[in-house]
Each structure stands twice: as structure tokens, then as C-alpha cells.
Amino acid sequence: MKRERINQIAALVDKRGVITLVQLREFFPKVSEMTLRRDLFQLEEEGRLIRVRGGAKSMKDLQKTSGVPYAKNTNLHATEKRTIGAKAAELIDKGASVFIDGGTTALYFAKEMPDVPCTVFTTGIAVAQELAKKENVTIHLLGGILKKDNLSTVTSVAPAYFHEINFETAIISASAFTTESGFSCDSMMEAEQLKLLRSKAKFTYMMLDSSKIGKVMPYTFANVEDINVLITDQEFPESLKTLFKSKNIVVM
């Protein structure tokens, strides 16, 4: 019975592209909202949809607009990314000037970010699309070469573009982290761009889920001492939390 309902929900989401909990209650009047929320959570864990505020969005729709690699990456460790994104979103205040990268964790941040008057600079196409739903957020999308794996842009003209621009906060996510190599990514141009954007910010918040620990990418863009706040999940090792805290870094 449960599996049949879950499959029906998945089919509805694929057919409509997006569906709200209110609409699901109309289709399943005898099922509680809490149960429907759990069904959506299970479907997201199975990689069949993406939960959004108040409902869910079709993976097929995301693949059409965002590319298959990005759609798959978005659902890897989705629970951890959602938790981290929500924590980071709580730190955004009215009037803030923020840079947010284009990683899949950043998409969850964008979904949870409050709709308050602020200015957001981003290299993420999907991030900008999500933020565009918020009436009070001013969005600056940096152009350049598109990285299809995370739908973010990189460009050699970033220094000129950001020459006279400063941020209160840079919110960055890493593809890999070790204590020896720091935070790293797979693109030299992206690494140089992230170093620049870090330098333009008063505070740097790093979003890092525990699955990235122990991985090394070719290009380091930040070391432990370069960040102010680490935002992570419950599985993050206590020994590493102690290391970050010993360097006066806030761990969330």
C-alpha cells in the first residue's frame, strides 16, 4: 500500500513537474501531511525527486534544465546537504552582501535562504534560478565558461569584474578536504576564482559534508586557517571539529 502510494506520488511529480503538499493532500485525502512529507523524503533519498519548500520537484524536469550530472550530484548525500544549506541560510541577515558558489550544496542553501532584502553574487545557474523566486533578493550572476558537473561558471575576467566589489560573507562548498591539502576542487581556474572571492569577503563560511573528508582534488583554494565558519553535518569527526575550533573557527 505504502509503496503503491509512493510510486503514484513519483508519477504525479514527473507528470506535473512540481507539486505542493496541498495538492498531494487533495490526491490522497486519507493520508496525513506528515506521512506525505515522509513519502517525499523517501523519494528524494531514492533519487526520484527533489524536495522544495512546500512540495517537490521532478528529477526529469531538473535533468532537462540542468543536465544529468548536476541532477545526480544534487541527490548524493541529499540529507546532509539540506541540513548544511539550512544552517548557512540562517546566517543571512537583511541588507547583507553575499557570495555563494554554484555547488549542489549551494542549491539547498538557496532553497532555504530567507526572502529578505539583500544582494547575492553567484556563479551558480541553478542557484540563481532558485533565488529568483525570492522577491527581495537582488541577484548578480557571473558569466563565463559553464562547468556542467555543477552548473557553475568560471572566468579569467573575474578579477576585473570583482575589482571594486566586496562581500560581507563568502559561502563556499568544497569537493574535497584533507588537513594536508586543505579544501580543493578539480579546476585550476575555479580554484583561483574562489581564492579571489574569498579575499573580497569579510567572512568566509565553508559548507562541507562529511562524505568529502579524505578526498583530494588537484587544486587547493583554501586552507583551514583561511575560513571563519565551518558548516557541516552530524557525521563530521570530532577530532576534526577540535582541530577547527583550536584555530578559532566556529563549527556549526
Task: Kindly give the residue locations of the regions a language model identified.
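Absolute protein N-terminus
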Residues: 1-2, 252
